[in-house]
Amino acid sequence: MFDKEKRKKSNIIDWIKAILIALILVFLVRTFLFEPYIVQGESMKPTLFNSERLFVNKFVKYTGDFKRGDIVVLNGEEKKTHYVKRLIGLPGDTIEMKNDNLFVNGKRFNEEYLKENKKDAHDSDLNLTGDFGPIKVPKDKYFVMGDNRQNSMDSRNGLGLFNKKDIVGVEELVFFPLDRIRHAK
C-alpha cells in the first residue's frame, strides 16, 4: 500500500515536471524564436490579406540579419499595435521613388512582389506609388512600405522611420487560413 502511494505521488511529480518544462519551452520559443501574429488591414494586399495569421521569426532580431524586401512585423506606439510591412530601406540607404520605380542608393530596385498591383494601377492609367525622395535613412533606422501602396500608412505618410528595437521579426510562414499556407514573398 505504501509503495502504491509512493508511486502515485512520484507519477504526479513527474507530470508536474513535464508540464513545467513544456511551459518553459513554449515561453522560450515565443520570446526568442517564433510568435504568431494576425494581419490587420489591407496594406499588404495582394501579398497578405486581412485576418491571415503568420509566424514571425524573432531570432533575426538578435542576429540583425534583415534584408531589403523582407516582410517584417513592427511594434507601434507603446507596443499596443503591430504593423506588417515590407522592409525597403536599411540604415544609410537613400530611397527614392520616380515614375513608379523604386531606387535604392541610386540603383533601380526590382519589386517583383508588386507585379500584380502595378499592372492594376497602370491599367487604370495610375502610378502605384507617388514620387518621393530622395530620403536618406539615418543610422539605426528602417524605412518600410506596404505592398498596397495606394492604401498603406507607412514610412512615407504617417508612421515614419522605425528603430531596430521596433522590429519584432521577419515573416516566416502564413499558417492560416489552412488553404493558403505559404511563405509570403
UniProtKB/Swiss-Prot annotation:
Principal location listed in the UniProt entry: membrane
Membrane topology: Single-pass type II membrane protein
Tagged with keyword rRNA-binding: no
Record PROSITE patterns: SPASE_I_1 (PS00501), SPASE_I_2 (PS00760), SPASE_I_3 (PS00761)
Membrane-crossing segments per the record: 15-34
GO cellular component, one term: plasma membrane
GO terms for biological process, alphabetical: signal peptide processing
Record topology, Cytoplasmic segments: 1-14
Active-site annotation: 43, 85
GO molecular-function terms, A-Z: serine-type endopeptidase activity
Family: Belongs to the peptidase S26 family.
UniProt name for this protein: Signal peptidase I P
Organism: Bacillus subtilis subsp. natto
